[in-house]
């Protein structure tokens, strides 16, 4: 019995060891991670976008102006406003000159020229020095000399590049009908009347536009704008200038207060704007 039981016990022990070993091996196999497949190849890099074509610079207003005919303008009408009275007798005459640079009349005149000629022309303002202004002052007759406007245009043109055309906007005298008096530039006029004993009051803008050749400064054309035709002025006692009738309450008192008057400023600017447009169109149309 003891000999049979011993081999049987040994066999049973071997079976148990075998079973345990197999179970452990299975467990180790399960614990091992499965072999990973090779990682997929990375997608090829995206093709670099083609460089955008360099945008051509747009033509600026300045470059456009370089290719256009140029009109250079010197305006001197916006410096003073006259408060003027013409009495029945010479002792009733008076004239006060008031600075009005703040009204911007010269800039207005040049903008209006640009409006009329359109974008086909490049218009720019020429500065006017004090020495150039003296060339416009009346001088005693000294024989046949060169037109003073030639010297004035040459002075304001300077030594820089020449313009195609030069234009000037300057005060011009206008005879007051029925008197030996005249007005010039911008102002308000009170005119005594011996017939009906009623004073006539007018705001006026008496000026002239002239055009000159850009190389020789030779005069090309000139226009003096008026509100009414010359024949109408002669028949009605009007002014050969831009003007409008106003109430006598418009007369500034004291005269120095004219520069602060909005109604005088606005009325004057309107006359200048209308007159410059008339004269510029006439110059463009030619003689």
Label for each model-derived stretch:
Residues 1-5:
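Positively charged n-region of N-terminal signal peptides that target proteins for export
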Residues 8-15:
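Sec-dependent N-terminal signal peptides
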Residues 28-118:
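General N-terminal leader/first-domain-start detector
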Residues 28-32, 46, 51-69, 77-79, ...:
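C-terminal/domain-edge helix-coil "capping" segments
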Residues 83-179, 199-226:
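N-terminal segment of the mature soluble domain
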Residues 83-103, 188-194, 242-258:
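A solvent-exposed, charged loop/short amphipathic helix patch at secondary-structure junctions
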Residues 180-185, 236:
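Outer-membrane beta-barrel translocator domains and adjoining extracellular loop/strand segments
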């Amino acid at each position: 019995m003891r000999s049979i039981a011993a081999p049987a016990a040994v066999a049973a022990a071997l079976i148990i060891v075998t079973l345990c070993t197999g179970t452990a091996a299975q467990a180790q196999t399960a614990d091992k991670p499965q072999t990973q497949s090779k990682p997929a190849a990375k997608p090829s890099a995206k093709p670099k976008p083609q460089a955008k074509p360099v945008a051509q610079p747009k033509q600026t207003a300045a470059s456009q102006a370089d290719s256009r005919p140029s009109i250079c303008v010197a305006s001197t009408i916006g410096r003073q406003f006259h408060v003027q009275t013409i009495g029945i007798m010479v002792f009733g005459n008076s004239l006060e000159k008031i600075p009005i640079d703040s009204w911007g009349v010269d800039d207005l005149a040049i903008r209006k020229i640009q409006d009329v000629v359109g974008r086909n022309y490049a218009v720019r303002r020429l500065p006017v020095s004090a020495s150039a202004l003296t060339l416009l002052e009346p001088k005693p007759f000294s024989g046949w000399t060169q037109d003073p406007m030639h010297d004035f245009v040459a002075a304001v043109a300077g030594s820089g590049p020449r313009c195609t055309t030069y234009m000037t906007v300057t005060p011009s005298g206008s005879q007051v009908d029925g008197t030996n008096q005249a007005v010039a530039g911008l102002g308000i006029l009170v005119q005594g009347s011996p017939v009906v004993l009623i004073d006539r009051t007018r705001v006026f803008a008496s000026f002239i536009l002239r055009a000159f050749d850009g190389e020789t400064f030779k005069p090309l054309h000139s226009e003096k704008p008026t509100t009414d035709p010359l024949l109408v002025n002669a028949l009605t006692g009007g002014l050969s200038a831009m003007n409008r009738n106003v109430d006598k309450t418009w007369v500034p008192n004291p005269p120095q207060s004219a520069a602060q008057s909005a109604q005088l400023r606005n009325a004057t600017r309107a006359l200048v704007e209308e007159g410059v447009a008339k004269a510029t169109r006439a110059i463009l149309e030619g003689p």
